From Swiss-Prot:
Disulfide bonds: none annotated. The gene is VGLL2. One of its GO terms (biological process) is skeletal muscle tissue development. This is Transcription cofactor vestigial-like protein 2. May act as a specific coactivator for the mammalian TEFs. May play a role in the development of skeletal muscles. It comes from Homo sapiens. Its main location: nucleus. Residues 63-76 have a biased composition (Basic and acidic residues). Pfam families: Vg_Tdu. Belongs to the vestigial family. Residues 44-57, 108-120, 272-292 have a biased composition (Low complexity). Residues 196-206 have a biased composition (Basic residues).
Amino acid sequence: MSCLDVMYQVYGPPQPYFAAAYTPYHQKLAYYSKMQEAQECNASPSSSGSGSSSFSSQTPASIKEEEGSPEKERPPEAEYINSRCVLFTYFQGDISSVVDEHFSRALSQPSSYSPSCTSSKAPRSSGPWRDCSFPMSQRSFPASFWNSAYQAPVPPPLGSPLATAHSELPFAAADPYSPAALHGHLHQGATEPWHHAHPHHAHPHHPYALGGALGAQAAPYPRPAAVHEVYAPHFDPRYGPLLMPAASGRPARLATAPAPAPGSPPCELSGKGEPAGAAWAGPGGPFASPSGDVAQGLGLSVDSARRYSLCGASLLS
């Protein structure tokens, strides 16, 4: 057994938890064993002992030098994350200061852009940007590039005095797509027969508050009528609620039928022998009322309704 075998004994199979810790030592042991085999093959048996002794005397010095290296003096910082992950930090120092120094040095250097990278057909100017002598810190970057907490200014609302002044400009009315022209399309006027104003809000059809000055702008095109305006009860005074011509000169309600005689049959409508369909076929029919109340067109008294229910079979037959 040589001195190497005494100093560096062969270990068993590495365990899974200690494999990373003993890997360098196993590599060193394999390297030394190969060196010893090469010396034994090349040297004579008499000189093999002196060679091995000289090699063994040099080995502890090299190991001490490796142990005294700065890497051994500064072990990595281990941070336990979970049962399967451990974070080792080999960097020593303040990370934030190193990162700031790196970026400040990179921004102070000239740009790496070269005009030779572009095609020869592209026009080239003699400005500092093309000359690659313009540092990045002096370029016109937006404020959000240098300050991450920068907030853009909020634009003024549409109902503010700035928006009102913008609508009063001479070119505002000439543009058909300007907010003033669009607002004028929606507020054309109350002279049209289908235009009506809702009493519960001042601007019935415009969802945006663009200010009072925008409503005064004129528009060359009429706005389309909404569905609820076409079918509104105030569609046209010439038509009734059922879009039928209004009948003039007729009573709003049917006259109450007189009470029958005590000896008359229950199905008799009146003492004069009035036919059953006279109340429906007359000018005061239920579907000719000009007013918006349908119940007025069906002006039947309680007695007439009771008679119709009693003799409904004879009337419908």
